[in-house]
Amino acid sequence: MSELFPRRIETDRLTMLPSTPEVLSPLDFYRVCSADPDIDEVTEHLTWEPHAHPKETLEFLRATSEGLESGDDAAYQVYVDPGDAPEGVDGPSPGGPYADSDLVLAGGAGMGVDWDRRTGTLGTWLRKPFWGRGYSGERAAAFVALAFDRLDLEVVAVEHVAGNENSRRAIETYVERFGGWKEGALRNWAFEEGEPVTQHRYSIAREEYEDADVEVAVEFHG
């Protein structure tokens, strides 16, 4: 993977590892992306739908791996310690260089980087048992620090489609925490099930991040 992005990101409760076929078995990930309880609800407002077959999952992981290698997409899988996992959720765990770990997959996180615009755009998803635990904000804080402190970007942006109230609440909380604000609504900007929908956009500028002076508990390894 690109030397621009860390090989491991750690916060108080989360461990984020590169989204590659070497780290997460495509077959294990397929079982999450195709048949996890509530997967239809989880993907309702995402850019991907439940996977139809294992090859789709392999192609998904190869695409995120290529984004990491090119330096254009910091794509990670989000894990928690087994003691923090909800009852009944016991995997999957990472493999490859992390095969000795018993971490439990909670979801995914990433930041697409537009180097010409010095802008990183955040994205995330979580398996439903992990909703409502503040993980989205904790993950966001780590990526905001990654954008400004390591990658020297000038703006961090995040968007959600109209009607995604869970994302709206989480985004408004952490954007305000870092001094950012809502830029506005982009009508018919995104698509859901082939239909145009309104997209709401928020951003944090470097100056706002520095003025907010928020201490972010995160460690970047590699």
Residue ranges with predicted function:
Residues 161-162, 185, 189:
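Conserved beta-strand edge residues that scaffold enzyme active sites
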